[in-house]
Design a protein with these regions (language model features):
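Extracellular beta-sheet/turn segments enriched in Thr/Pro/Gly and aliphatic residues
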Residues: 1-4, 82-107
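Exposed beta-strand and adjacent loop surfaces of beta-rich binding modules
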Residues: 11, 26-28, 69
Length: 107
């Protein structure tokens, strides 16, 4: 996606689709459990480079070791969770600086 980024950027991105595979646009995506307690947020549909419901959140600039797993969660327009928190451990490898996490509604 970002061939010239090298080690200058680390993030999580993906798509959110319904059970039929249609894009769900306008959900909040949050990433948390940063050492300083920060929660970062974006909306689905803002990053069409990944697809119609694409999202992206920067984790670090430059790529660095993140000491603990982070979580990602979807919320509706009222900020009510519509998914569980999914934990993931970012890699400090420059070749693995983009983490792709896709969500699919199952009911």
């Amino acid at each position: 996606i970002y061939p010239n980024a090298e080690c200058s950027w680390m993030g999580v991105a993906g798509l959110v689709n319904d059970a039929r595979g249609d894009p769900i646009i306008g959900l909040y995506v949050q990433v948390g459990n940063f050492p300083d307690g920060e929660i970062r947020e974006t909306l689905t549909g803002l990053f069409p480079i990944y697809g119609e419901s694409g999202y992206e959140i920067t984790i670090a600039r430059p790529v660095m070791e993140i000491p603990q797993p982070l979580w990602i969660q979807l919320l509706n327009e009222s900020h009510v969770p519509v998914s569980e928190k999914v934990y993931f451990k970012p890699s400090n490898s420059c070749e693995r600086s983009l983490i792709l996490i896709n969500f699919k509604r199952v009911r």
